[in-house]
Structures are given as structure tokens and as C-alpha cells.
Amino acid sequence: IASEDQLLESRRAMIPDDTDCRDLWVFGYGSLIYNPIIAHEQRLIARIHGYHRRFCLWTQIGRGSPECPGLVLSLDRGGSCVGVGFKLQPDTAIAELDLLWRREMMTLAYNARWLRLHTDDGIKRGLAFVANPRRPAYAPSMPFKDLVTTVATAIGFNGPCHDYLFDT
């Protein structure tokens, strides 16, 4: 688990405190779609290229336990993905990003990346969290039957893994 200092350092490496936040977008493809937690002034349907959405991160916290790990979605290399682009409110963007960093980066299972969000309103530059294949939480491809069993049976403090599937 990352410390507050590590999280802040990581966020500042991607988005320094003095960043102009007037056109700052975040790409949501999993729980951010239905529970964005960040104050935003606009949301648009967006497609990214070069990554696809996949259950590829083990969780022993939110949607699983040490005894029965669950799986959560991440972006993995290849393909494309439709999700939601959130334009952050400029006056609160840095504080909102710190909150988002605590939620998404605490286990260091993701890498933060700038991606092109293709929307009906043009191309936006957006921040996305993609799977870090070097972390132990990364789940390489598995038989479909095993994936279904995991999602159907795992439960964590945020509820059953299958609820996460249906919510996203």
C-alpha cells in the first residue's frame, strides 16, 4: 500500500500542483462511471484506442478478500474501450485528483497515462489508469470459467464482485 507521500509524489509527477486545470479530463471505464467521486463540470462518452477493458487486476480489498480474491477492471494493452470522459472543475481539480489518486493508486496496481479521448465534441487529452503488468495484482489471461467463478464468488468491503460487474 502506497503512503500518502508516495501518492502525492506520483500525482505530482503526472500533474504538478501548478498545472493549468482549465481543460483537465479523466477517463472512466469501471467504477468511475457510476461512482466518479470527483467534482466535474462535464461528462462525455469517450473512446480510447490502444487499450481494452478487462478484468485483469486481483483485489483482496474492495471486491475480494485474502481468502477469496476478486477481480476488478483495468485497461490492458490492445484494442479500444468506450467509457466516460470527465472534465474536472478547474478550481478544485488538484484536490479532486489527490482524492482520485488515493482511490486508484493506493496499491500501485495501475499506471497513470495520458490518452486521447475521442468524443463527439472532438479529441480531448485525458488521464487514465491502466494495468501495471509488473505488479503482483496483475492477472494475465485466464480461462473464462475461472474468471466467471471468481467474479461470482468474491466479496470484499465494497460488496460482491458480481455487483461490480453489473454496475459497470
Which role fits each region the language model picked out?
Residues 1-168:
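A glycine-rich, hydrophobic/aromatic-adjacent loop/helix-cap motif
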